[in-house]
Amino acid sequence: MQISPETQLFIREHQTDDVRALALQARKYPNVDMPTAITQIAGRQVAAEKIPSWSDMDDIWYPKHLSLEQCSSEVTARYKATLLKGNSLTDLTGGFGIDCAFLAAKFKSAIYVERQQELCEIAAHNFPILNLNHINVKNEDGVSYLQAMSPVDCIFLDPARRNEHGGKTVAISDCEPDVAELEELLLNKAGQVMVKLSPMLDLSLALKELQHVQKVHIISANNECKELLLILGQASVEEISIHCVNLPTKGIQEEQHFVFTREQEQCSECNYTNALENYLYEPNASLLKAGAFRSIASAFPVKKLHPNSHLYTSDVLVESFPGRAFHIISQCSLNKKELKESLGDLKKANITVRKFPATVAELRKRIKLSEGGDTYLFASTLNNGQKVLIRCEKA
């Protein structure tokens, strides 16, 4: 791919413009390769949010929209780079190259493997601009390359998670390449293997399908679950540690990190309550994905509302709780009189349902509240079966 000076100038001058409007003005700019310009402008706009350290570099090339939307964000790529170390790295599913770029910065040599020629051309162009001259780009199929490659310290791969009809998958065996089928070969080629998976995949099923998982990292960014990472190694471990991470992206919160094992979850003591106290807690998205419900109640001085509610309460604020904390203002049932007394002054609220016999939409219709504002309303069930609406504000 080549970009002419005229097109490069157009990209710089219009990098914040609406690409749909630009597409309609193509005839006004006969010397500009408009399809390429639109792809690059759209890429820069996504990068401004997703890869901020790259977005100000004029010479970075971006792929078509679909590939960019599927790639990692900078914050998750940086986190992954803290988990691997060694001299040599091979990325078998290169893609746009964000993960490879941040991982390779920690290695003396790296190989990027990608079967799409256009993505390889983009990666080969971008890596030197990022001062990553030690990455060797290979335009090959990842599985074929794996079979013939020499051993390295670490392998990274991000299997495709779409089925033949474009639907989302829940099992590793439905992904391409099939890591379960390749597990022994992968570990013959590297002492450590990192597999990046969609958070939509079933973690319990993944741990049954793979025999050599040592650690699991569930990564959220601003409380949105983004990635499921499995670290495979040749040495066996008695218990698989599960790391639940919530990363800040706006610089306004601290990283939250909680580690547990499935064995600890089964054995942890959990106190339940029939009465709300002063504060309410909602675990972050990584904890909810991991199922660390009893472990959280055991690790922090909080009580669980109900075995299936996944909400917690305490008398004194627990500032270190890995999730969102709220100050409880009031509580009520769905009784009309109680609703009026507790919520009568509200016009809008953020509503969450946890173990409650109504959807958010049904509740909004019944209590006539629009979305938004500073008030949070949790509809849940206490341990004695009592249904409650809990009015809160952020602690």
Predicted regions and their residues:
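SAM-dependent transferase fold signal centered on methyltransferase-like domains
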Residues: 1-395
